[in-house]
Amino acid sequence: MPKLTRSAELFEKAKKFIPGGVNSPVRAFKSVGGNPIFMAKGQGAYMTDVDGNTYLDYVGSWGPFILGSMHPRITAALERTLTTIGTSFGTPIEMEIEIAELLVEIVPSIEMVRMVNSGTEATMSAVRLARGCTGRDKIIKFEGCYHGHGDSFLIKAGSGALTLGAPDSPGVTKGTAEDTLNAKYNDIASVELLVAENKGNIAAIIIEPVAGNTGVIPAKKEFLQALRDLCDREGIVLIFDEVMCGFRVALGGAQELYGITPDLTTMGKIIGGGLPVGAFGGKRSLMENVAPLGGVYQAGTLSGNPLALTAGIETLKILKDENPYPELERKAAFLEAGFRDNMQKLGLNFVQNRVGSMACLFFTETPVESYDSAITCDTEMFGRYFTSMLDQGIYLAPSQFEAMFTSAVHSNADLEKTVKANYIALQAAAK
C-alpha cells in the first residue's frame, strides 16, 4: 500500500470547506473504501500524488486525455494564448469560428454548433432546443445513461448517481420527473411503448450511443437504427450524447462508427483538451432556433473563451492529422486479451465490454447490455480489485460503473505492467 499521509491530511481539511471533501461525488472513493488520493502532477500516462507516489493513469481526467496529460503541442499552444491573447473577452473571437469549422468537418451530424462550458450545459441546452422546436414537453432517456447533473437527467442516472446507489436526487421536482421518461437500453420495445403512451408529446430521445457511466455498454446498431426510424416517423428529435464517446471511439464519434446520424449531438471532454468546455450542434434547421437567431435562449459568460478553445482546437488538429485510432485500438485490444487470458488462468469468467479505447471489466458473469445487467456486478469484489491495482501503481476509476480509458501515450511497457497487475488484482478480488 503506498504511503498516503499527505492525501489523508488534505482530505480531512477539504471536508471542512467542501461538501464531502470533493467537487464531484465519484472522486470520494465511497464505493471502493478508503480516502481519495490528492494528485500533484500529471505527465503523459502518469500521475504523481502529493505523497510522491506515481500511478499509471487509466482515468485520463474522466476521458479528455486521449493524448495524455501535458501534451507538448497543447501546453505550448495554451502558453501562447495565455501570454499573447488573454483568458476571456466576453466578445466574439476568431477561434470560435475555427473550432466550429473543425466540428462541422469532423462530426457527421453537425451543420451548426454552439460552444458552452460543460457537457451538462450541452445536454441541457440540446433538450431545451428540442422542446422549443417541437413544442412538446417530455423526453425519453435510458436507464443508467448519464447526461450530466441537469434535473431532467437525474432519473435512474448513471455515473456518480449509480455509484452512490441514489438514482434520484432530492431537489428534482415532481413535474420535472414526470416529463422525463425512462426506457431500457438496447430495448426498442420499451421505447415504442413510451412513445405510444405519450403520442405527440415526446420532444426528444437522448442516448449515449456508447454508454460510459454504467461501465461501458455499446448500443446495438439495429437498436440505434430503430431509434432513428422511430424519431423520423414521430417527429421526435434524436440526440446523441457524445460527451464521453465523441472523438474517443472514432474521430467522428459513435455516429461515425455506427453510420447513424442524430439530429443533435452533445460534446465535451476531449474537445476541451482537459479544460472546461462543451458544445451542442446538429441540423441547421434546428440550430437556427438558438438565440439570438431564434427564440430558444442559451448563454454563457465564459462560453468560447480563448484558453478552452485553444486546447480544443489543438487536440482536434492532432487527432485529425495523426489519426491515433488504429494504435489506440491495438493497445486497448492488448489489454482486453491480457485480462481475458488472466481470467482463464484463474478460472474466472467476468464480462469485458470495450469500444475502441473505452473499456470496462464487469464483476459479473451476466452479459452486460443494459442497466439491469450492469447492476448484477459484485461491487465489493470490484473494490478489492481496485485497491490491489492501486497498490501496484495502476490508477483506475474508483467505481465499478465507470470506463477505463487507454490513451495514445500508454507505452507497450505500460500495457504489459497493467496486464501483470490485473492478474494479481483478480486473485485479490476473488478471495
UniProtKB/Swiss-Prot annotation:
UniProt entry tagged with the keyword Cytoplasm: yes
Name of this chain's protein: Glutamate-1-semialdehyde 2,1-aminomutase
CDD domains: OAT_like (cd00610)
EC annotation from Swiss-Prot or TrEMBL: 5.4.3.8
Alphabetized InterPro entries for the sequence: 4pyrrol_synth_GluAld_NH2Trfase, Aminotrans_3, Aminotrans_3_PPA_site, PyrdxlP-dep_Trfase, PyrdxlP-dep_Trfase_major, PyrdxlP-dep_Trfase_small
GO cellular component term of the entry, any: cytoplasm
NCBIfam families: hemL, PRK00062.1
